[in-house]
Each structure stands twice: as structure tokens, then as C-alpha cells.
Amino acid sequence: MQMSSKVWSAIKEEVALRIAAEPSLEKFLTNLVLKQSSISSATAAIIASKIRSDALASDEINNFIKDAYTRCANIEEKLEADLEFFKIMDPACQYYSTPLLFYKGFLAVSTYRAAHCLWNHDRHTMALFLQNRASEVFGVDIHPAAHIAEGVMIDHGTGVVIGETSVIEANVSIFQGVTLGGRGFNSGKPVSYTHLRAHETQRN
């Protein structure tokens, strides 16, 4: 899917400058960003390069995530909103390409977005596989059934757990060591439920 946006154009310009500054990373940055057609395709390629395993190679995971993204309503806008929110809220984030390439919180939420779409299309096993790999690699555990709006920032993120009963609205910041959602069951029903409103911040 070909997409054109101000953010995507800025990302490509930033990555070209990164290559000029660090030529040894040219192949890495070219393959994962400059050869891609949109924020979603670049995000899928970067995630796949991180969470590949003996079970599924990078190309296979890339295809699964891209396929999931095609089923997600407004996925480009959601990923773009996440990047925008990072740039606004994190003083250390001066470029859109920084969370895309290097922030595990952004990549964990982006993996969740693919898993959530798969979950909603009854592909629970693949959704849980993506959840598990993201938890192992990024240290952020987000259940595919959770509901997360656009414009969410998980900063640092180590030890963040977002359960299946969680609802997170737009423009919410979450830091490390935070658990949200059900922690137990009573007669088959969750006994805890978390709803983070817009503009909330959750810290350990």
C-alpha cells in the first residue's frame, strides 16, 4: 500500500541523514525504511527483524504483520499518531524516525496493533504468538484483546503488562513497571478492569 504523509516524508529525510552520518548502517536503514512504501510497511519490516525466531523467519513475520495491518482500520493514522505523540511528549525524541527504529515501547504497541487485528479476525494463535515474541524481545506484554487508541506512548516500557480487559484512550503515556487490566477471575469473570482516559500518565 502506497502512502504519502508529512510524517513519512520526514522519516525518509531523517533516515537519509542518518545514513550520511553512519554509512555502516546504510544497508540496515535502506532495507527497513527507504525501500518501504509507508509507515506501516517500514514498521512491519523493523518488527520482523526484531522478533524473528526459529518458529518463523523475518520474511514470514513481516508478511503476517503486513497482512494484519491491511485489516486494521486507519492503521497508517494510528502509527503516525503514536510517532507524533512520542515526539511531543518525550524531550529526548527529536525525530520521528527515533521511536520507529529504536524505541521498544513504540515497536511493542505496533506489534500489538497487528496482533489485535488478527485477534479480531479469529486468528488467536498467531495473535498470541506475536504477543509472546513481543513480550520476550521488548519486555512489554500486551494482550491482543486489549483496546488501545491511537497516540499512545509507552516510554522505556520494561515490565509493562496490559491485560485483555484494558481500555486505553488516545494521548496516554505509560512508563515502566506498570500492570493494567485483570489480575484474577471470579466465576469466570475478570475481577479487575482498567480504563485509562485521554491525557493520563501511568508510572510505576
Feature locations, PLM:
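Conserved small/polar residues in nucleotide/adenosyl-binding loops
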Residues: 194-201
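Terminal amphipathic alpha-helical/low-complexity segments used for targeting or macromolecular assembly
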Residues: 1-133
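Short glycine/acidic-rich loop motifs that flank beta-strands on beta-rich extracellular proteins
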Residues: 184-186
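Glycine- and small hydrophobic-enriched segments that form the cores of compact globular domains
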Residues: 118-128, 133-140, 144-145, 153-154, ...
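Secondary-structure boundary elements
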Residues: 121, 170-171
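Hydrophobic face of beta-strands forming the core of extended beta-sheets/solenoids
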Residues: 142, 148-150, 154-156, 162, ...
